């Protein structure tokens, strides 16, 4: 099966003579539901354990007064001469008491995700990076990008200096997305601002390489720009926030290696026992399939249109004659002939006269 060709661009932004076939992973089904499920589970695996102190709320001496004083049985601080004496303690409803069900560090922090499900979500996220509408909907500034997916020469992997790397990104049209990241830096709302998460900013392009010859260090200090190896692509980077459509810049070597990593119709995947997911139907034009002669010859002609009554008022057939006749047509004949009021005729034979005379004489 022939696949579309993708042009390779040089570090100066010019299109080269090289053209690569679109890898098969870009034709994988895009499943936002699977991506969201896997992302929410995988995103929990990097959490650090936290808990309140086991002594919190219990660092005081308190004892219940018991019954007979017309007050609650909650433990109360002893002593006198201060406002604290006599106040409730320990309980979660008390000021200065412990919380209800204090958090423990031995909570189950990690979530297990099926291996094949994670691969399905990653393949969907990769396929979504080639859909321009999804990339734009995610908020990336790709109006000046010559082509999506964007493939750059392998020379990008050998860049050592940040200045040269930024110049290469500007040359291929990613400058607008870099400016968007710089302008988006804001102070975080909430308590995270004093927990080493003081600032928030948007995500920029993701640069995918095949071999690190200096590109990682060159781009690690550019705001919003992330790097990833093509052999270990991460769903957290391909779809941040479980939102499909990350702007990805591929190097030529990494783009060529996608078929080796994920497999295709002719090349087996390097993942053991893995088959790339495919669509249930190969043609997306369902109208053309339904109206084809093969389908139309096998289906029955359409019947009369039926309209379902949304609300039916139930009527008592014992009081409503029309409803009674609709349910029981024989009721009309039954009423007209007055079959319910006729007396049954006795068909028994009269005794003989000799028998009657005999009874009288006796």
UniProtKB/Swiss-Prot annotation:
It is found in: Cytoplasm; Nucleus. There are 2 genes for uL4 in yeast. Component of the large ribosomal subunit (LSU). Mature yeast ribosomes consist of a small (40S) and a large (60S) subunit. The 40S small subunit contains 1 molecule of ribosomal RNA (18S rRNA) and 33 different proteins (encoded by 57 genes). The large 60S subunit contains 3 rRNA molecules (25S, 5.8S and 5S rRNA) and 46 different proteins (encoded by 81 genes). uL4 is associated with the polypeptide exit tunnel. uL4 interacts with its chaperone ACL4 and the nuclear import receptor KAP104. Component of the ribosome, a large ribonucleoprotein complex responsible for the synthesis of proteins in the cell. The small ribosomal subunit (SSU) binds messenger RNAs (mRNAs) and translates the encoded message by selecting cognate aminoacyl-transfer RNA (tRNA) molecules. The large subunit (LSU) contains the ribosomal catalytic site termed the peptidyl transferase center (PTC), which catalyzes the formation of peptide bonds, thereby polymerizing the amino acids delivered by tRNAs into a polypeptide chain. N-terminally acetylated by acetyltransferase NatA. The gene is RPL4A. This is Large ribosomal subunit protein uL4A. One of its GO terms (cellular component) is cytosol. Changing residue 295 to A: Leads to an inefficient release from ACL4 with a delayed assembly into the 60S subunit. Keywords: Acetylation, Cytoplasm, Methylation, Nucleus, Ribonucleoprotein, Ribosomal protein, RNA-binding. It comes from the Eukaryota. The keyword Nucleus applies. Changing residue 95 to E: Leads to a slower growth at higher temperatures but allows RPL4 assembly into the 60S subunit. One of its GO terms (biological process) is cytoplasmic translation. The eukaryote-specific C-terminal extension harbors a nuclear import signal and delivers the ACL4-uL4/RPL4 complex to the pre-ribosome, triggering uL4 release from ACL4 and incorporation into the 60S ribosomal subunit. GO terms for molecular function: RNA binding; structural constituent of ribosome. Changing residue 314 to A: Significantly diminished nuclear localization. The modification N-acetylserine is found at residue 2. The modification Omega-N-methylarginine is found at residue 95. Changing residue 319 to A: Significantly diminished nuclear localization. Belongs to the universal ribosomal protein uL4 family. Residues 277-362 are annotated as: C-terminal-extended nuclear localization signal. Pfam families: Ribos_L4_asso_C (PF14374), Ribosomal_L4 (PF00573).
